[in-house]
């Protein structure tokens, strides 16, 4: 029987070697898989860090540019406001000057017209008194004193035009 046991032992020996080899290979594969996993995790972390850093730099750049645009816009708006204010002031001054000139012209016209109207009124009054006296004289209603006072007022074109 010893030979059967020897054969059995010798037959199991390669199987044991195969199992041991398989175990060693499995352990080696596990180690390599773990190393690959660690390497991938490390690379992913590094990529994430670079992405965050890049995002921060980009955000800072965009923020700086946006601030510069905002500042430039404010400056432009302020300049436009100042220009408009200056134009408004000039327009107000010009309108005030024109209003004052119109007022002076109106006053001068009023004075001139008033003088003409006063002169014309005096002439009409004188003519009416002359006509009244003439009618009284015609009908003999005038007294002796009034007959001597009768005067004739004439209106000529040159006296009506006083400038």
UniProtKB/Swiss-Prot annotation:
It comes from Daucus carota. The keyword Repeat applies. Residues 32-115 are annotated as: 6 X 11 AA approximate repeats. This is Late embryogenesis abundant protein Dc3. Residues 1-117, 139-163 are annotated as: Disordered. Residues 28-56, 67-84, 91-113 have a biased composition (Basic and acidic residues). Residues 152-163 have a biased composition (Low complexity). Sequence repeats lie at residues 32-42, 43-53, 65-75, 76-86, 87-97, 103-115. It comes from the Eukaryota. One of its GO terms (cellular component) is nucleus.
């Amino acid at each position: 029987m010893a030979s059967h046991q020897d054969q059995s032992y010798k037959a199991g020996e390669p199987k044991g070697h195969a199992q041991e080899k398989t175990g060693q290979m499995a352990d080696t594969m596990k180690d390599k898989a773990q190393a690959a996993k660690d390497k991938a995790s490390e690379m992913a972390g590094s990529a994430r860090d670079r992405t965050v850093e890049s995002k921060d730099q980009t955000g800072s750049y965009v923020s700086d540019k946006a601030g510069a645009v905002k500042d430039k816009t404010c400056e432009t708006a302020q300049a436009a406001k100042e220009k408009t204010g200056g134009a408004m002031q000039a327009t107000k001054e010009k309108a005030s000057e024109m209003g004052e000139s119109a007022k002076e012209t109106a006053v001068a016209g009023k004075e001139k017209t008033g003088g003409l109207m006063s002169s014309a009124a005096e002439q009409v009054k004188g003519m009416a008194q002359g006509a009244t006296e003439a009618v009284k004289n015609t009908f003999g209603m005038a007294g002796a004193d009034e007959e001597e006072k009768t005067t004739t007022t004439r209106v000529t074109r040159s006296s009506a035009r006083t400038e």
